[in-house]
């Protein structure tokens, strides 16, 4: 019974090593990409960012 357990463990290790080496063909950066935060200041930062992009008519608001 002990030899069977060791054989099963060795087979599991070899199989997991093969899966890690081969992978599934996708790049982790593509699959798990996180969108960039264009507005790190939250809602007020987003408002100021929109004003800057649209050509703010009032200079003190644009910063």
Swiss-Prot record:
Keyword Secreted: yes
Propeptide: 24-54
Compartments it resides in: Secreted
Signal peptide extent: 1-23
Record InterPro entries: Conotoxin, Contryphan_CS
Domain of life, source organism: Eukaryota
Disulfide bonds: 56-62
Record keyword Signal present: yes
Modification type Cysteine amide: residues: 62
Tissue: Expressed by the venom duct.
Post-translational modification: The differences between contryphan-R and bromocontryphan lies in the state of bromination of Trp-61.
Gene Ontology molecular-function annotations: ion channel inhibitor activity; toxin activity
Residue positions, PTM 4-hydroxyproline: 57
Pfam families membership: Conotoxin
Modified residues (6'-bromotryptophan): 61
GO CC field: extracellular region
Keyword entries, A-Z: Amidation, Bromination, D-amino acid, Disulfide bond, Hydroxylation, Ion channel impairing toxin, Neurotoxin, Secreted, Signal, Toxin
Cited PROSITE patterns: CONTRYPHAN
D-tryptophan modification, residue list: 58
Note: Contryphan-R and [Des-Gly1]-contryphan-R exist in two forms, due to cis-trans isomerization at 56-Cys-hydroxyPro-57.
Domain notes: The cysteine framework is C-C.
Role played: Its target is unknown, but this toxin may modulate voltage-activated calcium channels (Cav) or calcium-dependent potassium channels (KCa).
Name listed for the protein in its UniProt record: Contryphan-R
């Amino acid at each position: 019974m002990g030899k069977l357990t060791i054989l099963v463990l060795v087979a599991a290790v070899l199989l997991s090593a093969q899966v890690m080496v081969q992978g599934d063909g996708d790049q982790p950066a593509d699959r798990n990409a996180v969108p960039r935060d264009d507005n790190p200041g939250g809602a007020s930062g987003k408002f100021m960012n929109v004003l800057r992009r649209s050509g703010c008519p009032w200079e003190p608001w644009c910063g």
